Regions:
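Primarily the internal scaffold of c-type cytochrome electron-transfer domains
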Residues: 24, 28, 35, 43-109, ...
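Bacterial N-terminal signal peptides
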Residues: 5-17
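Signal peptide processing junction and immediate N-terminal pro/mature segment
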Residues: 18-24
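N-terminal secretory signal peptides that target proteins for export/translocation
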Residues: 1-2
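Short, contiguous clusters of charged residues that form electrostatic/catalytic patches at enzyme active sites
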Residues: 130-133, 255
């Protein structure tokens, strides 16, 4: 088995191997759609079909309830009507609307901010085929502009399933749980990252890894957008943390977690759970599975409170508050969590002019205040104060 030794912002691991008995789906296999999977995997299918990934793209003619924006009040940003909407993308944080343009779709000029229930301008131009559709579908054909199905269906993560549907065996379908950690993470990073294919495809530029399917090596199809350490860029903070949503993969490949074989599925279940972000259990419980008090993985204190210096049960005592701060922009002031798992030291963040986890929560305080507070804590850790 091959494991990666490390990564920096903008790089993917180059080693991929398979666990015993696991290989890519047969080359002759074709895509059959998620409904074919439901015949044998009904409980999993029933959970999946309620997830956001299974419903992020909707046709409002079939699902008029999919449109959550308020069209009852006039707004200068809204220069279109519901009848012009051919496709709806999103529902949790934002919702975007697209009109049919020949055999393609084009964005309409306003998007709905779900959190604040207000319209915001949407300046994206160009067709969705090069920007969006490859990740929001199964088996998108760049020549014909056709799909096996819209949304993240079973075969997006398991590969083409015709052989398995005809004669189910463990060896004729990709199971990400049986892949080595790098290949398993590739399945998610293919879409949860900012990057580009290695070259033009059919003379066109795409923003998703054309040709990749589960079980292949993502690095052969996709190059994460690069970052120059110490500089703030459109996509990256100076320390390499992602500044925008959908950069979880760019973050994660920098992490010690990734280097040690932790995968996305160690924390998330893409088939759906009752927990936020489809976590396998509440976030704190996931972290404490490997990082309980006196754990060899740290923290080495006797209690969690001695490590966090916040009251048990408070927001400040949650592992994600310090190790996964909300610093990546989704829309307006709606932020999502970083996935490098680094503690961003306030004094370093101040030098780099970027957010830190302390003042992200304590919005009325300064990095200098945070540094002084960290210095005064019992169980003092110098690395929390300066690098």
């Amino acid at each position: 088995m091959v494991f990666r030794a490390g990564a920096v912002a903008g790089s993917l691991a180059i080693g991929t191997a398979w666990l015993a008995g696991q290989s890519p789906a047969p080359a002759a296999a074709t895509y059959v759609g998620s409904a074919a999977c439901s015949r044998c995997h009904a409980p999993i299918f029933d959970r999946w079909k309620r997830t956001r990934m299974a419903n992020v793209v909707r046709d409002p003619r079939e699902h008029p309830e999919a449109i959550v924006a308020d069209f009852t009040q006039p707004n200068p940003l809204v220069t279109f009507t519901k009848d012009q909407i051919a496709f709806v993308y999103g529902s949790k944080f934002k919702q975007r609307y697209f009109a049919k343009a020949g055999d393609d779709y084009t964005p309409l000029p306003a998007q709905w901010d779900v959190t604040h229930r207000q319209w915001r301008a949407y300046g994206l131009t160009g067709s969705t085929s090069g920007l969006c559709d490859g990740c929001h579908s199964v088996n998108y054909d760049v020549e014909r502009k056709t799909v096996t199905e819209w949304n993240v269906g079973c075969e997006r993560c398991h590969g083409p399933g015709s052989a398995h549907a005809a004669r189910p065996t463990a060896s004729n379908i990709v199971n990400p749980a049986r892949l080595d950690p790098v290949a398993a993470v590739d399945v998610c990073v293919q879409c949860h990252s900012e990057g580009h294919p290695h070259g033009l495809v059919g003379g066109r530029e795409f923003h998703w890894p054309v040709g990749f399917r589960a079980g292949l090596r993502l690095a052969d199809f996709w190059r994460l957008d690069q970052h120059t350490p110490g500089t703030q860029e459109t996509l990256y903070f100076p320390d390499g943390s992602g500044r925008e949503n959908r950069m979880q993969g760019n973050d994660f490949v920098q992490s010690l977690m990734y280097a040690r074989g932790v995968t996305c599925a160690s924390c998330h279940d893409p088939h759906g759970t009752p927990n936020n972000a489809d976590l396998i259990k509440p976030a704190r419980s996931i972290c404490l599975t490997c990082h309980g008090p006196k754990s060899p993985n740290g923290p080495h204190t006797g209690t969690i409170e001695q490590h966090t210096h916040h009251q048990a049960g408070s927001a400040g005592s949650e592992c994600v508050s310090c190790h996964m701060p909300k610093i990546a922009q989704m829309l307006g002031d709606v932020m999502v969590r970083s996935h490098t798992f680094r503690f961003i030291v306030p004094v370093e963040a101040e030098k780099l002019k970027m957010p830190d986890p302390c003042t992200t929560c304590h919005t009325d305080k300064t990095p200098a205040w945070a540094t002084a507070a960290l210095t005064s804590w019992p169980e003092f850790s110098p690395w929390r104060v300066a690098r």
